[in-house]
């Protein structure tokens, strides 16, 4: 079952991206390196509820 999640920048705490993930294959929280337009840099984005 795929669920929609939000990714939050770890530097400035802005929620920049939404994506989907399969909870069966990825039971933990996602961490992706994405571009943050507020920081003007690539930063780690963590999954939030």
From Swiss-Prot:
Record's keyword annotation contains Ribonucleoprotein: yes
Family matches, as Gene3D superfamilies: Ribosomal protein L33
InterPro entries: Ribosomal_bL33, Ribosomal_bL33_CS, Ribosomal_bL33_sf, Ribosomal_zn-bd
Range of residues in the leader sequence: none
GO aspect biological process, one term: translation
Pfam families: Ribosomal_L33
Keywords: Ribonucleoprotein, Ribosomal protein
GO cellular component assignments: cytoplasm; ribonucleoprotein complex; ribosome
Source domain of life: Bacteria
Gene Ontology MF, one: structural constituent of ribosome
Family: Belongs to the bacterial ribosomal protein bL33 family.
PANTHER family attached to this UniProt entry: 50S RIBOSOMAL PROTEIN L33, CHLOROPLASTIC (PTHR43168), LARGE RIBOSOMAL SUBUNIT PROTEIN BL33C (PTHR43168:SF2)
The name this protein goes by in its record: Large ribosomal subunit protein bL33
């Amino acid at each position: 079952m795929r669920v929609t999640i939000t990714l939050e920048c770890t530097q400035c705490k802005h929620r920049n991206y939404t994506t989907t993930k399969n909870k069966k294959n990825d039971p933990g929280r996602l961490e992706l390196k994405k571009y943050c337009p507020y920081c003007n840099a690539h930063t780690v984005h963590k999954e939030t509820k």
